[in-house]
């Protein structure tokens, strides 16, 4: 079985860390495509890094090998890749990570920068955070397996999405998953709806 694994979540939630955990536990992640590492290797040029990441994804799909991608899910690129992978009979697996506030993501990004990591403008973080449920909802119908992890205090699997339903693991449900469930039930009433003009994104983790 060919597997396309997506490590999703807004900026600063710990996508690379979860990839590391999963890689230590499993041998089916295949080629791991980390746009930030690719960009760093290209001298920090994010445009070149993004293009190279897309090239590696497309090559992996063409070769029919397992691949793993870290993404904020913003923009239309991930959905296009998922649809292409499905046409090629890939099993689509999504591990989505969340935290309860944009401020928490921003704090973690600042901590990352202090350790030599890459920065993300605060306005971009907040915009993507406010639009996260819409971005997630767009790809859920195309995924064969979805697990949702809370990362307030280490990675804990809190829910899964199956047969069109969001199923929580126990009574200790994070606020962001409660909000996601409300959004799924009534998207038009989303209290965190994206302001006009913020519909198109350039990927950046």
What would you call each of these model-derived segments?
Residues 1-4, 64-65:
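Pre-Walker A (Motif I) flank of P-loop NTPase domains
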Residues 7:
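Hydrophobic anchor at the beta1->P-loop junction of P-loop NTPases
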Residues 10:
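P-loop (Walker A) phosphate-binding loop of NTP-binding proteins
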Residues 14:
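Conserved glycine(s) of the Walker
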Residues 17-67:
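Conserved substrate/cofactor phosphate-moiety recognition/catalytic segment
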Residues 69-74:
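Short, glycine-rich nucleotide/cofactor-binding loops
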Residues 139-205:
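NTP-dependent small-molecule kinase module
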């Amino acid at each position: 079985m060919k597997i396309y694994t997506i490590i999703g979540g807004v900026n600063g939630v710990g996508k690379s860390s979860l990839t590391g955990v999963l890689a230590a536990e499993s041998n089916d992640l295949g080629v791991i495509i980390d746009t930030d590492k690719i960009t760093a290797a290209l001298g920090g040029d994010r445009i070149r890094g993004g293009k190279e990441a897309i090239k590696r994804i497309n090559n992996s799909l063409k070769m029919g090998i397992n691949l793993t991608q870290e993404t904020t899910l913003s923009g239309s690129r991930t959905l296009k890749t998922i649809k292409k992978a499905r046409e090629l009979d890939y099993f689509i697996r999504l591990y989505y990570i969340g935290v309860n506030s944009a401020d928490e993501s921003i704090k973690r990004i600042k901590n990352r920068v202090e350790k030599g990591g890459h920065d993300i403008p605060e306005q971009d973080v907040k915009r993507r955070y406010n639009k996260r449920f819409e971005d997630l909802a767009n790809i859920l119908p195309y995924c064969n397996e979805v697990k949702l992890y809370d990362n307030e205090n280490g990675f804990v699997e809190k829910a899964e999405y199956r047969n069109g339903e969001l199923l929580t693991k126990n009574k200790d449900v994070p606020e962001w998953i409660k909000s996601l469930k409300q959004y799924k039930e009534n998207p038009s009433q989303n209290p965190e709806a994206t302001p006009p003009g913020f519909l198109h994104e350039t990927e950046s983790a």
